[in-house]
């Protein structure tokens, strides 16, 4: 009686081990697929923000990490992708957080030329109200296109406000908090870059190490 019980116990343990291994393998494949999709989406967004004709490098390979809570809206290091032409920096795409969105953090990315001109802005993640605050998503509205070509004259440039506050940027009907937070976050990122270009371009390319 003992031998069959031991045998059955062994078989059950072996079966459980195999099942665990299969689940782990499937989970890893899923994680890898998600990472691959995220990387493809990032590359698509970067090439929208910084046109191919501006640079001759692979943007995702030239990535550094920036840390400034006041400017980037978070305590965490944020990736910045440097565009170069013939080895010389020509533009950058900086990820930032608008911490005061209506429903919490809004993650965005800002393309800026070395002359301080905004090349484009995209929303990477948000939880804003559908039909109201979600107009920050280019798939819902072209609202973010307002930033293209903008420059920041000073830290208190009054143009960098929503129209309700006396600035240049449209707000949403029934939703002012979201665009106000978004404009502020983009402005802060541009101001930070304009005043720290030399330091940023001298930082090590360390995004991959941070993600491991």
From Swiss-Prot:
Organism, scientific name: Shewanella baltica (strain OS223)
Secretion signal: which residues?
none
UniProt protein name: Ion-translocating oxidoreductase complex subunit G
GO (cellular component) term, any one: plasma membrane
Function per UniProt = Part of a membrane-bound complex that couples electron transfer with translocation of ions across the membrane.
**Cofactor(s) demanded:** FMN
Please cite one Gene Ontology biological process associated with this protein: electron transport chain
Positions of modified residues (FMN phosphoryl threonine): 176
* Membrane topology recorded in Swiss-Prot or TrEMBL: Single-pass membrane protein
Report TM segments: 9-29
